[in-house]
Amino acid sequence: MHYRTGYHADQLGTPPSVLETGPWRLHYQAWSRNAHDTRPPVLMLGGAFQSFRSFAAEVEELLEHHPVILLDLPGQGGNLQLAPELGLGALADLIADFAEALALPPLMPIGLSYGSALAALFASRHPQRCARLLLAGVTTFGRPGARALLEESLRLLEEERLAEFAQGSLTGLINPLRLERTGISPGFRKAMLRQLQRLTGAERERYRQNSRRLLDFAGFTHYPSCPTLVLAGEFDHFTQPWEHAAFAAACTQADCALIHDGDHLAQFERRDACAQLYRPFFLDQALPAAPIGATRLARSRLNEVERRQEPRLAPAQRAGRLHHAELGSLAVEVQELGFFGARLQGALPAGLPVRGWQLALEGLPMLDLLPLRQAGDALSLVFTHMDAAASTALAEHVRPAQLAAAA
């Protein structure tokens, strides 16, 4: 491997090197302080809406001690080649092909969000090629609510309802209830919303293919055996802390840490807290016992992490109505209400349609929702947050009661 030297953040926007393996083109940039570095490289694999430039600060930080490779597989990042026939496992195998073609030593992947599934599969399927593994925003998509929302996002794209798709996706990535803790600015949210609203036809197709891979993924048959570090944002409601902890518990040699005041974007919101953990991890040094801005979870307690991301409380006004274009209006009692979902009770017909539902509550706009589980006269649901005004109103409605309950 011949590494580029003289790194500067602006160079992440320059054309990548391209490796062809069979019909597939793999885009990469390889950086080091030494052009002929033989040390194990850190391999960066990003999420759905990230590019090489998203990792400018991390590359600068890591280059002090490691060579760094940024890799875009087909359909990822800036690689526009579509690969609908490749599942997650086949994409992960391309990482092994990449390492073999360039005669790389065992890699140290960093997998973020969508990239976490690829990195973890690479580590589990090719253990001899993986020295260490760092994951954040672990996407296994076994949780019914997450799957329902992802399916709905695909339907919205198919129907060209980009504004609603963008609003729902933004609410998944950024926790609106915790903005004062995560520090996400209105300007950042607006910029991300515009990016989502303006996806080109090719970008939408890539999103569709990547999302379908996640939904089609049957789960891990075996887990990484190399030293593994899993970082979870404490307010991540998209890929929740208990899911990170459960994944870490299934790995042979995993540590799991909760990043304070972070959500699904914790690795960008709380760079210092994350760095103080991954720096020693990649150097095979002991992790700090009491890291600043993070909490390490005891391995014996990984399967005991709280599964509910927010308190669901009984509203002061419990009477509500479910509306559906075909079934009309149905009276319900709201037993639990949160920002992300609710639990209702009422005389509901069996086999409810998947789409087209709204909940009417006194003092709130109509709330779009997806039914999740129906058991007798009880219904659990998730809110889709496709309407910004309704989402904001619901957040303002539930926040005081949730803060009081947590006090």
State the predicted function of each range.
Residues 313, 317-351, 356-358, 375-380:
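Short strand-loop-strand
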Residues 69-110:
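Active-site loop/oxyanion-hole signature of alpha/beta-hydrolase fold enzymes
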